[in-house]
């Protein structure tokens, strides 16, 4: 019976991931994106209640929500992948749902890499949650002038300042990529990217 209980919890976790993805991906443009973020955090709380975890140090979080929360981005787990190829960033959803949401009533504004043009399912999901997008080496190549690059960076700074003006936390993985063979979590934190 114990073995079945683990399988059942894993099944409930995966079903919850599917439910979350379908709700977010199929939401309409008219939906309030902050309300959708809160609903998604509540749904992820239910998902993470199916798996064992330990959180330490909540008492060390700042009282004010207007902070930048950095984390090391772990690689996706294949068995959590959806049929359409979407891979959840489970680590960032955990931080938002189980740490920031209970503390601040807000899972934070997340920054995500811009999806490649072949990842339409990913872009739609994060766009509906109103994430701030940044281009990384894992995004499609941008053929842009220095002036265009400067404008893109300026837009990012304006967007993030708007988040602080709303007294919301900002969540980012500044390493610029997920965990890989040459960038394993035991070797983290790696050096931050210049300007991070």
Regions found by a protein language model. Give the residues of each.
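Soluble catalytic domains of membrane acyltransferases
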Residues: 38-196
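Basic, amphipathic N-terminal segments that precede the first structured/catalytic domain
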Residues: 1-42, 103, 125, 141, ...
